[in-house]
Amino acid sequence: MNVVEQYNLTLKIEVLKEQSAETLARLCKLVDRSGTSDCIEVIKAYSHIVNTELYLATSINELEALKSDMAELESNIKESLAQISHGVSDEKCFKENSDVLDIEAYSSDDFDKALERTIDLLMFNKNISSAPHAVILGGQSGAGKTTIHRVKMVESKGDYIVIDGDTYRAQHPHFRALQEKYGVDSVEYTKMFAGKMVEAVIEKLSSLKYNLIIEGTLRSAAVPINTATLLKSKGYIVDFCLIATKPELSYLTTQLRYLEMLVVNPLQARATPKEHHDGIVKSLISNSNELEQSGLFESIQVYKRNLVQVYNSKQCTKPVGTIVENVLFGTWTQDETDLFNVGKAQELELRAKLP
């Protein structure tokens, strides 16, 4: 598979992951409201595809097959709930949420239920490790961190648990009502919930000694340093992996991801403000140096978008920031140029599909 095909596959995985994470959250809420345990195993099967099998897909055809499997599982869950006849439906749940006066708020019970549900699903078909390993990821929005998810998942045969705060937004008890009311700005009203969920999930799963991949941006060095300190205190080996991508290419990717979602379901589309993206880029060099100097990490690794590892602190003597700067702002390679040109063509095609 060439670099353009890898890029397209990763982009489709990212979009499908976001869509299916929202579907999973919605199905979980429906099952919870039904009061039945009949669908739990089917929910777990759906979750395993979302949280593991998507990352192991090696072709668009495999991805389409997984998409078909998820659609069948979703249909089975809805049919089972209809047969139970508890009067549970998407529309009823949404109406009840819409009637809540303060949809931005949530109770401790709401959070605890969402946390318990999330933990149970993430642990499904995963193994506790006697020598637990964690990989903390960094890179600006659109850099392609899913690339590293895929690399590490293949290396471990799917035995990492991915912790990604964006996929927890949909667990907010009033998520759909927030989307209806605020549109693309709804992310501002779910970020505190998602952030709290990430902290709680890390705390719980690290206490149980599961292997973890923890999504991040490296907007601040303090967050990965604090996370690594916590994990090392629990006996973890911790690596930091940065995906280094030309800013022009990563921002274009955020646009493509947004347009893909906009075409399928405008309510699910989530735009990335350019100032937010560029702010992360500006901090990557100094923050990566700070992480290396902290001495907390077993290794600092840097990957490019084409899956090539260009830096490993165990083998290189140069400061990591030097390598990061060169990849971000140095001469464009032919692969990078090809990816950008393909991306611009895809952007035009997607915009043509909009109403």
Regions found by a protein language model. Name each.
Residues 97-126:
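N-terminal pre-Walker A segment at the start of P-loop NTPase domains
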Residues 125-131, 205:
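Phosphate-binding P-loop
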Residues 140-141:
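The conserved Walker
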Residues 145:
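Conserved lysine of the Walker
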Residues 148:
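Hydrophobic positions on the alpha1 helix immediately C-terminal to the Walker A/P-loop
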Residues 161-162, 169-222, 228:
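Conserved nucleotide-sensing/catalytic segment adjacent to the nucleotide-binding pocket
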Residues 234-254:
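Conserved phosphate-donor/acceptor-positioning beta-strand/loop module used by diverse small-molecule
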Residues 252-355:
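Conserved GTP-binding G-domain of TRAFAC-class P-loop NTPases and closely related GTPase folds
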